[in-house]
Amino acid sequence: PEVEADLRRLELIWEHAREVCAPNGPWLCGEYGIVDAFYAPVAARIAGYGLSVSPSAQAYVEAHLADPAFRRWRAMGLVHGETLNRYAMTYDLTDWPGPSALPARAIETGTPENATCP
């Protein structure tokens, strides 16, 4: 019940942002911005736990899942170790609903682009 109330509140906040900003695209206030970065982890939780949200909220979640920067952020998080105990939850997880991971491999010659890219 409390999670449902929180989700309905999020839907109201996101709809209000769209009404005020009248964006032309998937993000809350036009171009991807700080508000969208703030809600990216929320979108990941909604998707990861298979929570039910309104169609417009689901479209916003799916925009995050398909965003290349979000996908890189998630991939980096997955390769940097175990979940910390304080963040581990006992909830059932669903298969990741976002796009499939892109095939990747470490470079064979040359210098890596940065410390994160092998």
What residues fall within each predicted segment?
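Acidic/histidine-enriched, glycine/proline-rich intrinsically disordered or flexible terminal extensions
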Residues: 77-117
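GST-like fold's C-terminal all-alpha helical module
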Residues: 1-66, 71
